[in-house]
Regions:
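Short glycine-cluster motifs
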Residues: 12-102
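Amphipathic, non-transmembrane alpha-helical secondary structure
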Residues: 79-90, 110-118, 161
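Short, small-residue-enriched loops and turns at beta-alpha junctions
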Residues: 104-108, 134-136
Length: 182
């Protein structure tokens, strides 16, 4: 939790979106977020329309669902993560994002961490990462996220608790400083 509070801006609400390329862990993360007191709501019609436009252009796979968590499938690429994350960061119904780029072969290349970090620059909404397990690749992903200032967790439950801490801190700031997170 401390890393999240140290490196990320507070979430100005408790509505979280989860972006992954592995459906099962995304659902586990959604459950963990809800159990922690966060909301994993449906996306707005505007956001869904943007995602559908990406599908129509061939920028997203047709099998990707528009539900939250968003599952790019095992075929998701670094570019897809970046484009969808940008849409989520712009969405008014999303206060923070949890990204879970699992290192599946072949489309998830080493540049997925950089692509996500570069996309997040300029946004004030918090982003956390999760790559489950203790494999060398998972540990490498988490280390690289941390180098970019994006706290990365080994379990969805830890990531959810950290995001909840950001939402609670944001709520505290809004109560005590109504103009926002000054």
């Amino acid at each position: 939790m401390g890393r999240a509070l140290q490196f990320q801006k507070p979430a100005l609400g408790n509505r979280i979106s989860i972006l992954t390329n592995a459906g099962g862990p995304g659902v586990i993360a959604a459950d963990a977020c809800i159990e922690s007191g966060l909301r994993v709501d449906s996306l707005s019609e505007t956001t869904l329309r943007e995602l559908e436009e990406m599908k129509a252009k061939g920028e997203l796979l047709g099998i990707m669902t528009g539900s939250n968590p968003l599952d790019l499938s095992g075929q998701g690429t670094s570019e897809m993560f970046a484009k969808v994350l940008r849409i989520l960061m712009d969405a008014s119904e999303v206060n923070g994002a949890l990204v879970m780029p699992f290192h599946q072969a072949p489309p998830i290349l080493d540049d997925v961490v950089r692509a996500i970090a570069e996309t997040h620059k300029g946004y004030t909404k918090p982003i956390l990462a999760c790559d489950v397990g203790g494999t060398e690749m998972a540990e490498d992903f988490r280390t690289r996220f941390e180098k970019y200032g994006i706290p990365a967790y080994e379990t969805p439950e830890r990531a959810a608790r950290a995001m909840y801490a950001l939402a609670r801190y944001g709520s505290h700031l809004c109560i005590h400083h109504p103009s926002g997170a000054d």
